[in-house]
Amino acid sequence: MAVTTLNKMADVLTRVNGNSQMASQCTDLANEVKAALQKYAVYDHPKYGKIYAYEVDGMGNHLLMDDANVPSLLAMPYLGDVDIDDPIYQNTRRFVWSKDNPYFFRGKAGEGIGGPHMGYDMAWPMSLIMRAMTSRDDKEIKECVQMLMDTDANTGVIHESFDIKDSMHYTRPWFAWQNTLFGELILKLVKDGKTDLLISCKK
């Protein structure tokens, strides 16, 4: 995210402010961070191959997990940080949406990624939204949209998190951030010509 933001800053500084010196500093720092990420943040996983680590310390230690909050590893293409077809991202995507991610939860009510501050078995709808946003697979997208509809506890809105065993147990009856992202997802799917997919989802 830092690399993407620094490059955007350089573009604004060049085209709007005319400050080529500061723009160059931003670009140099972006390139330095990008090189460091490739050197230190890529972990060769025995099951998934090369994946992006959630945290590194620059001394060879890696924290392998993902958190539902955006920015996240899952959301990197959505934020413009990597190409959706980047093989390391695709490996990472498989990792974070699996039991190998300590904060991925699956139960009879649904599945998704949560995070350390919500505790175990509480999945965030935001992770389902980001999974759909970063997918080219219509079946996967439909599964995400359907699950978002099925885990709203009959309220018609998206919550902060839901219990994977019983979605009637949730946190925050109204969570504007995720509801806004859900609206963005629906608009994206309509723009992408996937109205039939949306219509096929049942409530």
Predicted regions and their residues:
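Heptad-repeat amphipathic alpha-helical coiled-coil interaction surface used
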Residues: 3, 10-11, 23, 30, ...
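Active-site catalytic microenvironments for nucleophilic, acid-base chemistry
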Residues: 8, 12-15, 135, 188
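Long alpha-helical scaffolds in large eukaryotic adaptor/regulatory proteins
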Residues: 13-20, 193
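C-terminal capping/lid segments that line or modulate ligand- or cofactor-binding pockets
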Residues: 63-83, 120-203
